[in-house]
Amino acid sequence: LDDIRARTQTSKSQLFHYFPDGKEQLLLAVAEHEAKMVLDDQQPYLGALTSWAAWQRWRDAVVDRYRRQGQNCPLAVLMSEIGRTTPGAQAVTSALMRKWHDEIATGVRHMQTQDKVAAGLDADRVAAALLAGIQGGVGVMLATGDLGYLEAALDVGIESLRNEG
């Protein structure tokens, strides 16, 4: 907290006015902001998965985000500082995953209405699989620096969806 006070030139009383529960509350606020940035960095593509070209633009935005970020994941650092199993950290992570999942599922459903994807596909399962692939690819990238796993997860996931059309 002393580092934050020094960088923001705020007093301890100001800091505790906005974050009365202290460090964890402050870190959760920053984690919520970082989680929002994960989705914002994918817009407008994530919110407009209406064609195969749009899916490719979204894929490229996801890969670009993690290429720029590299092995320094602000959200992962914050969560490790807070503790991944605390109720606050789980709420931030759950909200991020739910919003991300819902955006992908909406894109799948849109493609179904255009008869570009089989109507019988479960859009929620497809979204869950794509999101799990992204998370796995990001995990490998954070551990090794290799972005290829993320690219493969997205490419194979989108291509599989496309072949269901």
Q: Language-model features: where?
A:
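Hydrophobic alpha-helical bundle segments that form small-molecule/ligand-binding pockets
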Residues: 85-87, 98-126, 161-165
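Hydrophobic alpha-helical connector segments
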Residues: 40-71, 123-130
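Amphipathic C-terminal alpha-helical segment
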Residues: 65-68, 110, 130-148, 160-165
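Amphipathic alpha-helical segments used for helix-helix packing
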Residues: 27, 54, 67-88
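Helix-turn-helix
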Residues: 1-29
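Conserved terminal C-lobe alpha helix of the protein kinase catalytic domain
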Residues: 60, 94, 98-101, 105, ...
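Short, basic, alpha-helical segments at the C-terminal edge of helix-turn-helix-like DNA-binding modules
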Residues: 31-38
